[in-house]
Structure formats: C-alpha cells, structure tokens
Swiss-Prot record:
Record's function text: Probably functions as a manganese efflux pump.
Protein name: Putative manganese efflux pump MntP
Annotated localization: Cell inner membrane
Annotated keywords: Cell inner membrane, Cell membrane, Ion transport, Manganese, Membrane, Transmembrane, Transmembrane helix, Transport
Listed Pfam families: Mntp
Length: 189
C-alpha cells in the first residue's frame, strides 16, 4: 500500500470516532483540553489495536485465499464504506444521553470499541495486501487520537452540522482506498 493510501485509510478509519467525539464534546458544557486528550488517547489506542487483531485473523486465513486476497480487501472496504455512507444518510439514532461531564473511562472505551469494529474488518483486509501492519495501525491510532481530540473540543459548535457528513466522507474514502488496492494488484498482474 502506498503512503498516500495509508494516510487516507488512517483518516477514513477515524471519521466515525470523530463523529462520536463531536457528540461527546457537545454534551460537555465547556470541553477542556485534558478531557479531549484523554478521550483521544483512549479512542486512538483502541483504534490502533483493532486492525492488528483483524490482521492476525486475516493472516491465519491468508494461505487459503491467496489467489483472491485483493478482492477480499476490496469488497470489505467497499462494504464498510457503503455502510458508513448509509449511516451518515440515516436519521439520527435515538441514543441514551449522558449527563455533562459523565465520560468515564468505561463509557469512552465502549464507545471507542463500537466505532473501531470497522478497523477490525480493515485489519482483516490488510492481511491480504502488502502493508506494514504496525505502521498502518500506528497511523490509524494517531489519526484517530488527533481527530477525536479535535472532535471533542469542537463538539459544542460542530455537533449539529458535521457529525453525519464526516461519516459519509469516511465511507467514500474507504471505497476509494479499496478501489486503489484492487487497481494496484490488477495492474501489477
């Protein structure tokens, strides 16, 4: 995977966490930088671990699917991208509102895990392409930490405007990364 695709992948993986962080930030009266950084670190670490787990699962299966691995990566990324676009187009979910300032570690960790399931699937797909998984996981974690920290700080102002659009943009980027992987493999053959 080329460096530009890796950067796009990292930021695409962070968009759903960014949208969640905007929601978290909007529930705080005045988000403090320390709270935003804490939230960003929790999300970033979890988002970096999940593609590693997915990659390990993909590696275990890679010997059985080596001839069509690029198609698996492509299909997974396109399906995840379409899912993110669909979620971005849907009406807001009815969610249980937290009280301001009630962002415990466990609430943040569960939210981070929920938004990182797509990174697990991407990790499975990355097992079938030429990529340094530790570099990819680190990039995904760093991008997520950055985007979540910003999303938490900007949540109050941007919550109503950006949340759904960020998820849709992330979905489009995932589809483009999947198409790039497929193109690179087919053009090399």
């Amino acid at each position: 995977m080329n460096p530009v695709s890796l950067i796009f992948l990292a930021f695409a993986m962070s968009t759903d966490a960014f949208a969640a962080a905007i929601g978290k930030g909007s529930s705080l009266d005045r988000p403090r930088l320390s709270e935003a950084l804490r939230t960003g670190i929790i999300f970033g670490v979890i988002e970096a671990i999940t593609p590693l787990v997915g990659w390990l699962l993909g590696q275990a299966a890679s010997q059985f699917v080596a001839d069509w691995d690029h198609w698996i990566a492509f299909v997974l990324l396109v399906l995840l991208g379409l899912h993110m676009i669909h979620n971005g187009l849907r009406a807001d979910h009815e969610t249980e509102q937290e009280k301001p300032g009630q962002h415990s570690f466990w609430i943040l960790a569960v939210t981070a895990l929920a938004t990182s399931i797509d990174a697990l699937a991407v990790g499975v797909g990355l097992a079938f392409v030429d990529v340094n998984i530790f570099l990819a996981a680190g990039a995904i974690g760093l991008a997520t930490m950055t985007m979540v920290t910003l999303g938490t700080m900007l949540g109050r102002a941007l919550g109503a405007v950006t949340g759904k659009r960020a998820e849709m943009v992330g979905g489009v980027v995932l589809i483009l990364v999947g198409a790039t992987i497929l193109y690179e493999h087919l053009s090399a053959a």
